[in-house]
Amino acid sequence: MTSGVRMHAMPEDGTCAIAEVNRPAISVVVIGRNEGTRLVRCIESVRQAHGITIREIIYVDSASTDGSPEFASHLGATVIVVRPERPTAAIGRNVGWRHAASDLILFLDGDTILDPDFAFSAYEVLSQDVSLAAVWGHRREIHPETSLYNRVLDLDWMYRAGLSEFCGGDVLMRRDALVKTRGFDETLIAGEEPELCRRIRNLGYGILHIDCPMTGHDLEILRWSQYWKRATRAGYAYASVSEKFRMSADPFWTADRRRNMMRGSFWGVSFIVSVVASLWAGVLPFVLWLSILLLASIRSAWKARWKGASPGVLLLYGLHSHLQQLPILFGQLQFQLGKRRKKAQRLIEYKGRPVA
């Protein structure tokens, strides 16, 4: 699976040198493919972490063609290039943590920027509570002003602090929990973090979301097609993860998957019916459908008001929470079709060209 491991010395400034006395040390695993300058920005942010020693930065690259491995190597990271037939984020993360030397592993996506205080804050929490296996914080969009998609989807990253069922791709984890669970499921093209968290929780560990900044993220969604693909991938994740635990004593995401099917079907079928009816009875049926969608969006916006966005953005977020059910439904149906045909789904990518 790996096409070679290249080891590189850490910078002479000591940012990523051997752990200093009395300072906690962690390993950082960054994964990416064709992230370009986003990757450079990510690694540089790791080197600026406060209060903690970065023992090593391990960058696992999925056969980039934009020079990402060379960028990471120049910044002092250990670079591992993987070339699987079916690349997944899970493969990269597993390769990374298995090469790491520390008991605590900070996972990052290559398109993120680490908040300088998060690693130490998360370390403090884990060191004080042995029942926790993972700690994560707030991920927010770096450029919400770039598009309405970015501005609205920025709110999707916001979760209330406290114990949670799962985390995302940016998280500080105990190596012990990864060893006991054997890490991420490499067959999943999406949803690998919640799936792992489900198995971690079954071991008796907790997953904690703390109320502090963790990472900045760059969705870079500028077109409807990108939005559709991202939501389709989410639907595929719901279906594939819930299918894995469907017959277990502790099913996971089964209710979510069923609810997604119902909501997506409702909006899709009702839209078609309203359009067809409008051909015979004028615009009234379609206006009625729009009114129902608007009322549902207002209700969702009101429920999300704790996220602190402006009324206009909240209304768009409410609209998003319903319209995304269509591509989510499509993703779930895509999983079912692939399962019936016994055909593995390749990675669903929504980003455009890499940033050079």
Task: Walk through the language-model features, giving the residues of each.
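Short, acidic, metal-binding catalytic loop of nucleotide-sugar glycosyltransferases
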Residues: 44-54
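A conserved acidic beta->alpha catalytic loop
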Residues: 45, 61-69, 112-113
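Glycine-rich, basic loop-to-helix element that forms the pyrophosphate-binding segment
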Residues: 83-100, 165, 169
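Short aromatic/hydrophobic "clamp" motif used to bind/position activated sugar donors
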Residues: 105
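Conserved donor NDP-sugar-binding/catalytic core segment of glycosyltransferases
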Residues: 113-148, 218
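A recurrent flexible, glycine/aromatic-enriched loop bordering the glycosyltransferase active site
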Residues: 140-142, 156-179, 189, 195, ...
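Catalytic donor/gating beta->alpha subdomain of glycosyltransferases that bind UDP-sugars
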Residues: 187, 194-252
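Membrane-embedded multi-pass helical conduit in multi-pass membrane proteins
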Residues: 264-340
